[in-house]
Amino acid sequence: MSMYNEGRVTIIAELSHNANGSFERSIEMVEAAADAGADAIKVQVRTIPDDLPDPDKRKVVPWTGEEMSYAEYRQLCEYTPQQLSDLADLTRGLGMRFGASCWGMNAVDTLCDAVTDGPDFFKAASASMTDLELIEEMSIRAWDRGIPLLLSSGGCELGDIEGAVQSCVAGCDLWLAQCTAEYPCRPEHLDIGVIDTMRELYPDLLIGLSNHGVSVAPIVGAVALGARWVELHFTLDRSLPGTDHAASFEPSGVRKVRSYVDTMMAALGDGTKRVHPAEAATMAKLRRVS
């Protein structure tokens, strides 16, 4: 099963840290995402504290009210290698693909070692787009395994994107997403028109939208502009305490996205202007001059 099938937009459900440290909730999220029509599950893999900008600062855990170091907080949100393996098995058993944003070289190794036969895709998060050594390594791993490397462009200018693309090994299957690193993102900051620009600059890449908004409409618009994959932050309940719930879609929202983008893809056609058989009876009745 390919990550992308022509004519169907690939929807990736990003679990982020919305399980609030609960592996049981993670399992529920994977099952709910599959039921809602997602094609893939994505998680985050970090090596704590190596991949943290400031691990020593204090953090109040939103769902417990307990104060701890930032490193302790991030560790609470991380999956163990066994949990990564179990989530991958569950995801694949439900007919979806499994991958992760890897925040460092050690995280890449952790993911590859933990998951049977390795992940189905890698992703470079927006914050990693200037880490060209990491992106190059992920592209080599992706090329070697025959899987995609996804690039997210939040907080990037075109030069940053070009640097990341050029750092990838030739022949790697690259997927590039328009993204705005704002959580949740206001519609006027989504800039989905950039999808046109990306398609023009990178005609050989699969262009998509890494979405942090909470409306279905811009996602459908992005598909109309040529996006063929969409990443959504996913939660079981947007009212839960935590860092990403407010910028996430619940199962009902993902179900709407699936329905609406499928409808849009059917409506787009192939660009050929034609007379459909269903129009014949109408024209026979209304057209006065043949």
Regions inferred by a protein language model and the residue ranges of each:
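Catalytic cores and adjacent flexible loops of soluble metabolic enzymes
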Residues: 1-290
